[in-house]
Amino acid sequence: MPEELKVPRLVTVAEKRAMEEDFHMSSARDTGQLLRTLAASKPGGRLLEIGTGVGVGAGWLLDGMDPAARLITLEVHPEAAQISKEMLASDSRVEVVQANAVDWLRAYDGPLFDLIFVDASVPKYEERALTLSRIAPGGLFVCDDVIWSAAWDPQVRPSKDRVDKFRAEIHGEPDFHVSLLDWGPGICVATRITADAGH
Protein backbone atom coordinates (compact mmCIF):
# COMPACT_ATOMS: atom_id res chain seq x y z
CA MET A 1 0.00 0.00 0.00
CA PRO A 2 1.46 3.43 -0.89
CA GLU A 3 2.63 5.43 2.12
CA GLU A 4 0.19 8.24 1.40
CA LEU A 5 -2.71 5.80 1.89
CA LYS A 6 -1.57 4.54 5.30
CA VAL A 7 -3.93 6.63 7.38
CA PRO A 8 -4.09 5.48 11.03
CA ARG A 9 -7.49 4.25 12.17
CA LEU A 10 -7.50 6.78 15.00
CA VAL A 11 -7.02 9.61 12.50
CA THR A 12 -9.89 8.36 10.35
CA VAL A 13 -12.17 8.19 13.39
CA ALA A 14 -11.09 11.66 14.57
CA GLU A 15 -11.62 13.14 11.10
CA LYS A 16 -15.14 11.73 11.06
CA ARG A 17 -15.82 13.19 14.50
CA ALA A 18 -14.49 16.55 13.33
CA MET A 19 -17.00 16.53 10.48
CA GLU A 20 -19.82 15.63 12.87
CA GLU A 21 -18.82 18.49 15.17
CA ASP A 22 -18.43 20.94 12.25
CA PHE A 23 -14.78 21.40 13.26
CA HIS A 24 -12.65 22.61 10.34
CA MET A 25 -9.27 23.23 11.99
CA SER A 26 -7.80 19.71 11.98
CA SER A 27 -4.39 18.96 10.51
CA ALA A 28 -4.42 18.09 6.82
CA ARG A 29 -3.27 14.60 5.89
CA ASP A 30 -0.02 15.77 4.29
CA THR A 31 0.79 17.66 7.49
CA GLY A 32 -0.15 14.57 9.48
CA GLN A 33 2.20 12.35 7.52
CA LEU A 34 5.05 14.75 8.27
CA LEU A 35 4.13 14.75 11.96
CA ARG A 36 4.21 10.95 12.00
CA THR A 37 7.64 10.93 10.34
CA LEU A 38 9.08 13.49 12.75
CA ALA A 39 7.61 11.71 15.78
CA ALA A 40 9.27 8.49 14.63
CA SER A 41 12.64 10.30 14.70
CA LYS A 42 12.31 10.76 18.48
CA PRO A 43 12.32 7.26 20.04
CA GLY A 44 11.49 7.50 23.72
CA GLY A 45 10.83 11.18 23.15
CA ARG A 46 8.77 13.71 25.06
CA LEU A 47 6.32 15.36 22.68
CA LEU A 48 3.95 18.29 23.14
CA GLU A 49 1.05 19.30 20.93
CA ILE A 50 -0.52 22.73 21.40
CA GLY A 51 -4.04 22.78 19.99
CA THR A 52 -5.52 19.28 20.16
CA GLY A 53 -8.78 20.03 18.42
CA VAL A 54 -10.56 16.68 18.33
CA GLY A 55 -7.42 14.57 18.10
CA VAL A 56 -6.44 14.35 14.43
CA GLY A 57 -2.90 15.68 14.87
CA ALA A 58 -2.41 13.61 18.00
CA GLY A 59 -3.47 10.53 16.05
CA TRP A 60 -0.71 11.11 13.51
CA LEU A 61 1.90 11.79 16.20
CA LEU A 62 0.94 8.67 18.13
CA ASP A 63 1.22 6.57 14.97
CA GLY A 64 4.86 7.64 14.64
CA MET A 65 5.80 7.34 18.30
CA ASP A 66 7.47 4.25 19.71
CA PRO A 67 6.13 2.54 22.88
CA ALA A 68 8.44 4.53 25.16
CA ALA A 69 7.56 7.98 23.79
CA ARG A 70 5.01 10.19 25.55
CA LEU A 71 2.72 12.95 24.28
CA ILE A 72 1.04 15.78 26.17
CA THR A 73 -1.57 17.60 24.12
CA LEU A 74 -3.14 20.89 25.20
CA GLU A 75 -6.61 22.14 24.23
CA VAL A 76 -8.12 25.35 25.58
CA HIS A 77 -11.75 24.63 24.69
CA PRO A 78 -13.43 22.31 27.23
CA GLU A 79 -15.76 20.61 24.75
CA ALA A 80 -12.99 19.81 22.28
CA ALA A 81 -10.72 18.64 25.10
CA GLN A 82 -13.42 16.27 26.34
CA ILE A 83 -13.93 14.84 22.86
CA SER A 84 -10.18 14.34 22.51
CA LYS A 85 -9.95 12.61 25.88
CA GLU A 86 -12.62 10.17 24.71
CA MET A 87 -10.97 9.68 21.31
CA LEU A 88 -7.50 9.06 22.74
CA ALA A 89 -8.43 7.21 25.93
CA SER A 90 -7.24 3.83 24.63
CA ASP A 91 -3.60 4.98 24.26
CA SER A 92 -1.68 5.25 27.52
CA ARG A 93 1.15 7.22 25.87
CA VAL A 94 -0.93 10.40 25.60
CA GLU A 95 -2.30 12.85 28.16
CA VAL A 96 -4.93 15.40 27.09
CA VAL A 97 -4.85 18.58 29.18
CA GLN A 98 -7.58 21.21 29.03
CA ALA A 99 -5.67 24.44 29.61
CA ASN A 100 -4.63 27.78 28.21
CA ALA A 101 -1.35 26.89 26.50
CA VAL A 102 0.52 30.05 27.48
CA ASP A 103 -0.43 29.67 31.15
CA TRP A 104 0.51 25.98 31.03
CA LEU A 105 3.88 26.67 29.38
CA ARG A 106 4.71 29.37 31.93
CA ALA A 107 3.96 27.01 34.81
CA TYR A 108 5.64 23.95 33.30
CA ASP A 109 8.83 22.91 35.10
CA GLY A 110 9.31 19.38 33.77
CA PRO A 111 11.82 18.02 31.24
CA LEU A 112 12.26 19.86 27.96
CA PHE A 113 10.45 18.48 24.93
CA ASP A 114 11.96 16.68 21.96
CA LEU A 115 9.20 17.87 19.64
CA ILE A 116 6.57 20.58 19.98
CA PHE A 117 3.83 20.84 17.36
CA VAL A 118 2.00 24.16 17.57
CA ASP A 119 -1.45 24.38 16.01
CA ALA A 120 -2.57 27.48 17.92
CA SER A 121 -1.91 31.13 17.15
CA VAL A 122 -0.64 32.80 20.33
CA PRO A 123 2.06 30.20 21.20
CA LYS A 124 3.21 30.41 17.56
CA TYR A 125 3.21 34.19 17.16
CA GLU A 126 3.14 36.48 20.21
CA GLU A 127 4.51 33.90 22.69
CA ARG A 128 6.86 32.01 20.39
CA ALA A 129 9.90 32.69 22.61
CA LEU A 130 8.16 30.97 25.51
CA THR A 131 7.31 27.97 23.33
CA LEU A 132 10.84 27.70 21.95
CA SER A 133 12.30 27.84 25.46
CA ARG A 134 10.66 24.50 26.25
CA ILE A 135 12.48 22.61 23.46
CA ALA A 136 15.48 20.39 24.22
CA PRO A 137 18.76 20.59 22.28
CA GLY A 138 18.17 18.72 19.04
CA GLY A 139 14.43 19.07 19.55
CA LEU A 140 11.96 20.16 16.90
CA PHE A 141 9.54 23.08 16.68
CA VAL A 142 6.83 22.33 14.13
CA CYS A 143 3.88 24.48 13.13
CA ASP A 144 1.51 24.79 10.20
CA ASP A 145 -0.53 27.55 8.56
CA VAL A 146 2.51 29.63 7.60
CA ILE A 147 1.24 30.42 4.09
CA TRP A 148 -1.62 32.90 4.38
CA SER A 149 -4.71 32.26 2.27
CA ALA A 150 -7.48 34.70 1.39
CA ALA A 151 -9.86 31.76 1.79
CA TRP A 152 -9.16 31.54 5.53
CA ASP A 153 -11.94 32.40 7.94
CA PRO A 154 -10.64 35.49 9.80
CA GLN A 155 -12.56 34.42 12.90
CA VAL A 156 -10.44 31.30 13.36
CA ARG A 157 -7.30 31.76 11.24
CA PRO A 158 -4.41 34.20 11.68
CA SER A 159 -4.30 37.47 9.76
CA LYS A 160 -1.93 38.03 6.85
CA ASP A 161 0.08 40.48 8.96
CA ARG A 162 0.67 37.87 11.67
CA VAL A 163 1.72 35.23 9.17
CA ASP A 164 4.01 37.62 7.28
CA LYS A 165 5.62 38.76 10.55
CA PHE A 166 6.21 35.14 11.56
CA ARG A 167 7.86 34.33 8.23
CA ALA A 168 10.05 37.43 8.46
CA GLU A 169 11.18 36.71 12.02
CA ILE A 170 11.52 32.94 12.30
CA HIS A 171 14.81 32.72 10.37
CA GLY A 172 16.29 35.14 12.90
CA GLU A 173 15.95 32.70 15.81
CA PRO A 174 19.63 32.37 16.82
CA ASP A 175 19.39 28.95 18.45
CA PHE A 176 17.54 27.18 15.65
CA HIS A 177 18.03 25.92 12.12
CA VAL A 178 14.76 26.71 10.32
CA SER A 179 13.06 25.38 7.19
CA LEU A 180 9.83 26.77 5.74
CA LEU A 181 8.07 24.24 3.54
CA ASP A 182 5.78 25.94 1.06
CA TRP A 183 3.31 23.14 0.46
CA GLY A 184 -0.13 22.47 1.85
CA PRO A 185 -0.93 25.11 4.48
CA GLY A 186 2.77 25.93 4.83
CA ILE A 187 4.91 24.17 7.42
CA CYS A 188 7.75 25.39 9.61
CA VAL A 189 10.25 22.89 10.99
CA ALA A 190 13.03 24.20 13.23
CA THR A 191 15.69 22.34 15.24
CA ARG A 192 17.38 23.67 18.38
CA ILE A 193 21.13 23.72 17.81
CA THR A 194 22.41 25.04 21.16
CA ALA A 195 22.59 23.46 24.59
CA ASP A 196 21.28 26.62 26.27
CA ALA A 197 17.53 26.11 26.09
CA GLY A 198 16.76 28.82 28.62
CA HIS A 199 15.29 26.34 31.10
Feature roles, as predicted:
Residues M1-L115, V122-V142, V146-H199:
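A short alpha-helical cap/connector motif
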